[in-house]
Amino acid sequence: MPIYNFSAGPAVLPQPVIAQIQAALPSFRNSGMSILEISHRSDLFEQVINDAEQDLRDLMAIPDNYRVLFFQGGGTLQFTAAPLNLATNHHHIGLLDSGHWAQRAGDEAQRVDTKVTVLGSSAATHYDRLPTIEQPLDPTLDYVHLTTNNTIEGTMTTDLPATGDIPLIADMSSNFLGESYRVSDFGLIFAGAQKNLGPAGLTLVIVREDLIGHAQQLPSMLDYQLFADKHSMFNTPPVFAIYAAGLVLKWLKQQGGLAAMTARNHAKAALLYDFLDQSQLFTNPVKASDRSTMNVPFVTGNAELDAAVIAGASQHGLLNLKGHRSVGGMRASLYNAMPLTGVQALVDYLAAFEAQHH
């Protein structure tokens, strides 16, 4: 029986990548050393990290005036790093409140004495749609914070808000490399790797050069300029996580690149949404135009029935469908490495469940 992992993160990895990792565990590139033990100062790893950066630049068409930084600490650390590095003029940022992770970003910014102005919120409708900017932008805003994909609520931004000369920064953790964006539309992009890029332990930061280097007396581990100057080698980077991410990037190139993967992701999501929309048992609460292609929440409206759906799914090799604890129900995460056959298997199971229980 095939196994399909619908976890929101850490998430499914491409099978060819897992096979390459297995081969590198005993001896990486015939060095006699495992990938888990090579030095971050070695020529072997220098090639790994340089290749990973170049492949990322190729896939996303990253302009030359942007730096690519390899951080640790997850996207959550960037909720602190971003205001410390970029909110240096007025210590004031704007935030689009699209749900849990946007709120977390605002909370962390306030912890470092940054004023947070909520520019729009969809809280009144339980985050079933994306917020819009509801007021003129204050010229004292150092930047506007956007969560491009809301993993819990199941919404995703494709049409970016107009912010004029105010930099737009994006937490892309859950649709990084799963949806096409133009890097030059952003001052900063950050993303935890554990959705579409690799195992947990690595965070990618892509930042425009002119925005960094203005903060003073930053903690070293949060300093974008320092990491840029040291080529992400200020301290020991997450060697294995960067290696695994590099393999995923090469796999993504082999799949046709970002445009091809975006199209595949839209097709996978459409298959599931089309079923949910015609279902008499399952519903998706999200406004159709704002639906995520990465994370699809759905419910029966009955907690006991939801639990039965999840338990039965596990018996059919459909794993990790339980929704986030804050919303309940089910959630299917359809990241890049989830094949169309996995989504079809889920739809077939849900249809059979509905026929039996409705």
Predicted features by range, described:
Residues 282-313:
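Conserved PLP-binding catalytic core of the aspartate aminotransferase-like
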Residues 87-103:
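Conserved PLP-anchoring active-site segment centered on the Schiff-base-forming lysine
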Residues 2-53:
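A glycine-/small-polar-enriched, mobile loop at the entrance of the PLP active site in fold-type I
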Residues 32-78, 85, 100, 108:
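Conserved N-terminal alpha-helix of the aminotransferase class I/II PLP-enzyme fold
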Residues 169, 183-194:
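Conserved active-site segment immediately N-terminal to the catalytic lysine
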Residues 3, 315, 328-358:
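PLP-dependent enzyme catalytic core of the Aspartate aminotransferase-like
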Residues 193-273, 287, 356-358:
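Active-site C-terminal subdomain of aminotransferase-like
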Residues 109, 121-176:
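Active-site phosphate-binding strand-loop segment of PLP-dependent enzymes
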